[in-house]
């Protein structure tokens, strides 16, 4: 080009994008969101996370979820898309499918559900008609909104019939489940929940379902990681369909997964997800699911799952040793419900006090709870996140002691606060979390 020649003009498309579009960081492009993210990172680093539905994902999972896969539309399924250019997202989805099948011993897997609620909606869409009767664990006894709560679509469009737990021990009475099923002849029976700490008798549930001609579904969203790690019974051989979120104890990105061994049902679930409920799948999330499934297939994940359960038992026993009531007397999985009534405490007040002390949990209703849902008589505690960062039995015994210290202090106060105790515990929490850093 001669010295007098002018450089070629930018194309209209190039000219419309600022030079920083492909290079600016979040801090440059949106300082307010960058500050919120930095604040959340600090919170996760310096607080002990005991919310049972939360976990800490690997950097690899986050990298996949923040990848260029987010740019791609891919309506349909691998090899049968409504868009071109899907050859690489097909690779990611096929890997996710095959790894999920291997992880849980299932013949078929749908990795496209955007959430746990949507995966359960898809099963309902595939197996039920509006007005059909189905059974699930009562939300007040540890079930989930999508299992027939009156405020949820499942309770509005269908006819839910609930089973509960025994008042005397907080455990599901399988004979009562059988009686309810026989009396109501549901088309679908669901096992699983969000706050039930004991093992599920999948074999008996299937026998009951078969006796009334019902489909049997297991929602293992909370304990899927324990199933993958071999420390919890696998529902896949017993159920017509199994659903799970991919986060929680499975330690992946937020999303859903549907598993079955029945090819005819698999086709129904695929159609229910697309085009029934969703359009284009979130390919960046599916890529992250594939990464998480690969992580869960490694031997060290079995060690992790074992530690989650051991830590939960240690935390429950420590709290019992400090005079706290644990619903059902203990735990077989990753979570527990603490009944605060003997301490004359409410769940909402206790949650806030623990958060001020650097321990994150959630208020939770207990079986036969007289309090309103935003007050509650209990708190729910879980061990997956703190176990991920390296806490063991000794650390959870310390955590149990700190929880007891805070709650006993606010029980003796007039306003539900104990500033000196909360501050002292928060300092010890920071010492503990500093020993087990994340995302360095």
UniProtKB/Swiss-Prot annotation:
The record marks 247 as: Plays an important role in substrate specificity. One of its GO terms (biological process) is glycine biosynthetic process from serine. SUPFAM superfamilies: PLP-dependent transferases (SSF53383). It is found in: Cytoplasm. InterPro entries: PyrdxlP-dep_Trfase, PyrdxlP-dep_Trfase_major, PyrdxlP-dep_Trfase_small, Ser_HO-MeTrfase, Ser_HO-MeTrfase-like, Ser_HO-MeTrfase_PLP_BS, SHMT-like_dom. GO terms for molecular function: glycine hydroxymethyltransferase activity; pyridoxal phosphate binding. It holds the Pfam family SHMT. CDD domains: SHMT. Its cofactor is pyridoxal 5'-phosphate. Its main location: cytoplasm. Homodimer. This is Serine hydroxymethyltransferase. It comes from Rhodopseudomonas palustris (strain BisB18). The gene is glyA.
């Amino acid at each position: 080009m001669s010295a007098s020649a002018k450089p070629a003009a930018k194309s209209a498309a190039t000219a419309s994008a600022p030079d920083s579009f492909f290079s600016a960081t979040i801090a440059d492009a949106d300082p307010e969101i960058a500050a919120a993210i930095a604040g959340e990172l600090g919170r996760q680093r310096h607080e002990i996370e005991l919310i049972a539905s939360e976990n800490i994902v690997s950097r690899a999972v986050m990298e996949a979820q923040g990848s260029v896969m987010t740019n791609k539309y891919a309506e349909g399924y691998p090899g049968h898309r409504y868009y071109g250019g899907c050859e690489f997202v097909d690779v990611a989805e096929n890997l996710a499918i095959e790894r999920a099948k291997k992880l849980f011993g299932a013949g078929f897997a749908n990795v496209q559900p955007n959430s746990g609620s949507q995966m359960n909606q898809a099963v309902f869409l595939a197996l039920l008609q509006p007005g059909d009767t189905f059974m699930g664990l009562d939300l007040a006894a540890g079930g989930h909104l999508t299992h027939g709560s009156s405020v949820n679509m499942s309770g509005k469009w269908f006819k839910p019939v609930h089973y509960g737990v025994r008042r005397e021990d907080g455990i599901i009475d399988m004979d009562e489940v059988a009686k309810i099923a026989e009396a109501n002849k549901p088309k679908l029976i669901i096992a699983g929940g969000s706050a039930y700490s004991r093992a599920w008798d999948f074999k008996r549930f299937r026998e009951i379902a078969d006796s009334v001609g019902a489909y049997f579904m297991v929602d293992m969203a909370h304990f899927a990681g324990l199933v993958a790690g071999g420390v919890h019974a696998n529902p896949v051989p017993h159920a017509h369909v199994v659903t799970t979120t991919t986060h929680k104890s499975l330690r992946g990105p937020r999303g859903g997964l549907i598993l079955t061994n029945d090819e005819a049902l698999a086709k129904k679930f695929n159609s229910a997800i697309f085009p029934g409920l969703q359009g284009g799948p979130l390919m960046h999330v599916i890529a992250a699911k594939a990464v998480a499934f690969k992580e869960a297939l490694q031997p060290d994940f079995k060690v992790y799952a074992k530690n989650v359960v051991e830590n939960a038992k240690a935390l429950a026993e420590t709290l019992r040793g400090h005079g706290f009531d644990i619903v059902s007397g203990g735990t077989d999985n990753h979570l527990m419900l603490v009944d605060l009534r003997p301490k004359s405490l409410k769940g909402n007040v206790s949650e806030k006090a623990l958060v001020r002390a650097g321990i994150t949990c959630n208020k939770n209703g207990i079986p036969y709870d007289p309090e309103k849902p935003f007050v509650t008589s209990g708190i729910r505690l879980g061990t997956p996140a703190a176990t991920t960062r390296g806490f063991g039995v000794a650390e959870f015994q310390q955590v149990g002691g700190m929880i007891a210290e805070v709650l006993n202090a606010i029980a003796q106060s007039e306003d539900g606060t104990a500033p000196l105790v909360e501050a002292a515990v928060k300092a010890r929490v920071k010492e503990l979390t500093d020993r087990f850093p994340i995302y360095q």
